[in-house]
Curated annotation (Swiss-Prot):
Keyword terms, alphabetized: Amino-acid biosynthesis, Cytoplasm, Diaminopimelate biosynthesis, Lysine biosynthesis, NAD, NADP, Oxidoreductase
Family per similarity comment: Belongs to the DapB family.
Binding positions for NAD(+) per the UniProt entry: G10, A11, N12, G13, R14, M15, E36, G99, T100, T101, A123, A124, N125, F126
GO biological process, any: lysine biosynthetic process via diaminopimelate
Protein name: 4-hydroxy-tetrahydrodipicolinate reductase
Organism: Neisseria meningitidis serogroup C (strain 053442)
Domain of life: Bacteria
GO CC annotations on file: cytosol
Amino acid sequence: MTPLKIAIAGANGRMGRVLVEAVNNHPDTVLSGALEHSGSEALGLDAGYAVGLKTGIAISDDVDAVLAQSDVLIDFTRPEPTLKHLQKCVEKQVNIIIGTTGFDDAGKAAIHTAAEQTGIVFAANFSVGVNLTFHILDTVARVLNEGYDIEIIEGHHRHKVDAPSGTALRMGEVIAGALGRDLKQCAVYGREGHTGPRDPSTIGFATVRAGDIVGDHTALFATDGERVEITHKAGSRMTFAAGAVRAAVWVNGKTGLYDMQDVLGLNNR
């Protein structure tokens, strides 16, 4: 079997470094390119330097050259560069795995349009455990239905720039969908001052940014006399990276827009 050629965007970032390692660890993939922004101090260095690997792949800012020798790009950067990379992937017929969060509606629309021409796995979280959590939350929300106050609490490291996290928002979307609600209409982001009694139709979000927290997420369902808490805690970024590589292998040869639920076969159940 010919190894799948995977390029990494943001290869010198916290997530990018782990992705390089994850590609190296997978028996059916090979690192074909590593991208960083122009002016990065990492340009020209071996992509594996930060994790003790010698990959033979130099970090580059030449998107066209990197994609020309790749089957798929994994991108966990920021919305603006991701959308630029997305357009290049469409032009080069390269699949793309998108773990970037914080897209506005226009950005999400661009991803949907691009999926008509290439294969895309776009997910708020690539952890197998988190995606099982989404599946569980759908069941819990349908069974508990009305009568429970719902709050989502998430925590990440001090460097994360968007809040709430994409995973927390996806948890909210799953729960709202199961209850027949529109998250945009029922979400409450933080509370301050004299807020009055809680509106039972809302889904609340609370955010923590501290230290080196990789990712903690809890969905709380509370009513008189009992609480149900569904929690996922990530201890290493490798859980996300390994899932992204798994998605890259899965989407090879496909066109269309998918998420991690598709990769795991959970949307077929």
